[in-house]
Amino acid sequence: MPKKLTSISHIIILLFLISICIWDRIVNIPKFPFNFFYVTQLNLYINIIYYLLIIKTDLNNLNPILHYQRLFNFIFSLSFLVTIMFWGMLFIDKGTLYKKGLHIPFILNCSLHGGVFIINACEQLFICKRKNPKYCSVNLYFIITLIYTVSIKLIQELFNIKTYPFALKSIKIMIFVNFTGFLTCVLGHYIYIFLSKSKKSNNEEEEELVETVIN
């Protein structure tokens, strides 16, 4: 994709993510006052940070493909986790996610729990296709899922804020949820690697040509 069109695409994506964030705050704060502890919201915030950083590289006339590669790998896997875990739990038992009678707008729900992953997939496939980029360590996903599980348990015990009460009923359930989250992230990680094995994009070829001429 041409650099100018890439920059415009990134700005549109950022505006969309910010609008979803604002909508989520307006709709969900009365129902979930502490919903910024949820993986869904954390994923949204990290994506916003990523696109702010990547737009900065666009404005500095740098090739976004060569920057923040591990961060993009991480948010791709995290977005995949949010999508699979949410719809999976919703299919199994809606009561594990929502209290009886609670309603979230359908478009907002889909944007939060699938829309962000679709954006990340389009980013890799069409906007900034990365060929054999730098990847996150698989160990990172285990460490982060473990830290997150322990953190929400501590938050519940110290402040009585129940982020995922169904997941904290027993140590066995906590271990299962942590391990499932880890495996889902790893699956997303390898999907990203698979998508990265396609042929090089025009931007990468141009960048490599420039580097060759300079050197």
Where are the regions a protein language model picked out?
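Core segments of transmembrane alpha-helices
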Residues: 76-80, 84, 112-121
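Membrane-interface loop-to-helix entry segments
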Residues: 106-118, 175-179
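Central hydrophobic cores of alpha-helical transmembrane segments
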Residues: 137-146
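N-terminal helical submodule of small eukaryotic multi-pass membrane proteins
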Residues: 1-86, 90
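Membrane-lumen (extracellular) interface motif
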Residues: 20-40, 59-68, 88-108, 125-138, ...
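Membrane-interface transmembrane-helix boundary segments in multi-pass integral membrane proteins
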Residues: 2-5, 157-197
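Non-transmembrane, juxtamembrane loop and terminal tail segments
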Residues: 200-215
